[in-house]
Amino acid sequence: MTTTISTEKQSIKQIFLWEILWILVPFGIYFLSHIVHPDWYKHFVYQSWGFLQGRLDLLNLPEYYVDLIYWKDKIYLPNPPLPSILLMPFVAIWGIATEQIRVCMLFGAVDVFLVWILLGRMTVQGVMRFGLTILYGFGTVHYSASIIGTIWFYAHVVAEWGMLLALVEFFGKRRFVLVGFFMGLAFLSRQATILGSLFFLGWLLWERPEKWIQKGFSFGAGFTPLFLFQSWFNWARFGDPMESGYMLQNYYSSVQAPAIHKYGLFNFAYIPKHIKLIFTEMPEFLPQFPFIRPKPEGMNIWLTTPAFFALFAANWFDVLVILAGLSAFLISLPAMIYTATGWVQFGYRYALDYLPFLFVAIASGLQRMPQALAWTLIALSVIVNVWGVYWVVKLGW
């Protein structure tokens, strides 16, 4: 009995130490990466302030803010409410002065910790578990998103939080009511992420068909309350439970406006420019030192994160890898037909909507390839993203 209690205390102590390592250290690095920052485009702070005042609209926004909805003499956001809800304790203390970017850094660090837990539950051990965690936190666009922290990037980081919680639960006790709830959290930040439910429900259908209805119902029981909350949020503002505001959006940046007037917000005509950005867009080459810098439009995923090449080495005969790839593909589709490609950004920020799922396949590939090559790809990815963050800060993105 004494031995059991001692072992449990030791286990709790180890977990606490890893929490310190994988939350405080990444947060510290994110903080130091962007100490002096422009305190702008923090729409969610204003939304959170409105919630605390019992309002659903936004007041006293700076004039330069974009991506807004003007509806019946009020200003609204088309974005789901979870990022604003999570800010409420901070806004209750500091009001509009709350630095959204710091909260984004905190959730970015929590995401890194969840990746560490996830990899352990995926039976990735030893130095590769460490390397993959570093890769996620500092070798992907998660790094730059976490230290930019404006409305668009903060929403991505919170959505990652929900998806990673769902994956951690799935690779753990597989309580599908919690998996559904966590995916609901992701949905309340970035709605396209709900398409990642294929990963969990597809696994049920493939591996546990006799429990598909039971577990699928449990998933729905966890997800439905959050879906209903989003529906109420829509109805309370626009009188339509299915209208989030995107189709009512009427204030765009000057860059987006011409295409929107021709094609609308969503159109298949936008797919080619997304494909170009994702797979072939190069950085900007300069005639003088430093000779190269990232473009504000973005940069292809292979240069941004060379470890993505590990996808070609992944075990695509593994049902989980297949489902991870399919889920990532499905989640990517709504963004592919959207007018904006994510500008201004380092890399391709919409990849964050499916990075947690894609990372399952990346982890598979990095473990299967020669370790020297795997570590080279991880190191290159970190170097590129440190370079990217340098320019993000220098250029004021």
What are these regions (language model features)?
Residues 1-397:
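Membrane-proximal envelope and lipid/glycan-remodeling enzymes
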